[in-house]
Amino acid sequence: MKKALIVIDVQAGMYTAGMPVHNGEKFLEILQELIGECRSNDIPVIYVQHNGPKDHPLEKGTDGWKIHKAIAPLEGDCVVEKTTPDSFHKTDLKEVLQDKGIDHVIISGMQTQYCVDTTTRRAFSEGYKVTLVSDAHSTFDTEVLRAEDIVKHHNVVFGAFADVITLKDLKETVSK
């Protein structure tokens, strides 16, 4: 199986939106390590970037819209722009994956209960083998749930659609 890493919506505006990202700095460190591991195993990294409406923290073209500098794309990396929680809906993600011969996606990013959830389910429905890195997705606290609980809950639910593994476990199997 040919793999690709998808990094969803880890944009500067997520870190300036007025709410702290759950395990924010550690999350970025994990993503850096995950991206590095994939690059060293010739696994392409595909960034998904949300285009928010005017005055939104992720408004297209603003500083908040940019991919977070800690994990910024390198020259030649693919960036797919989207306007909905589904990274496949009205984007060229499926075509990018097909052009690269990808049949196994590794998913990471933000926000767990929105874009990571929707993209994980859609990738499964599109027929991809899906791996979700359980410590490489995050979100914010909400009015009803703490971010930590959202992440834990989704790591259980995602098991119906994906292999849910830690970065440590992924590193042991990524080259296979």
Whereabouts are the PLM-identified features?
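Short, well-ordered beta-to-alpha junction loops that form the rim of enzyme active sites
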Residues: 50-51, 110
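Short acidic, Gly/Ser-rich segments with clustered Asp/Glu that frequently serve as metal-coordination loops
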Residues: 13-17
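A short alpha/beta connector and helix-capping loop motif
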Residues: 20-49
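Glycine-rich, proline-tolerant flexible connector loops at the mouths of alpha/beta enzymes
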Residues: 18, 52-56
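Active-site-adjacent betaalpha module
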Residues: 3-4, 32-36, 41, 58-176
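Short, glycine-rich nucleotide/cofactor-binding loops
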Residues: 18-24, 108-111
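Short coil-to-beta-strand
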Residues: 1-10
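Short beta-strand segments at enzyme active-site cores
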Residues: 7, 44-50, 133
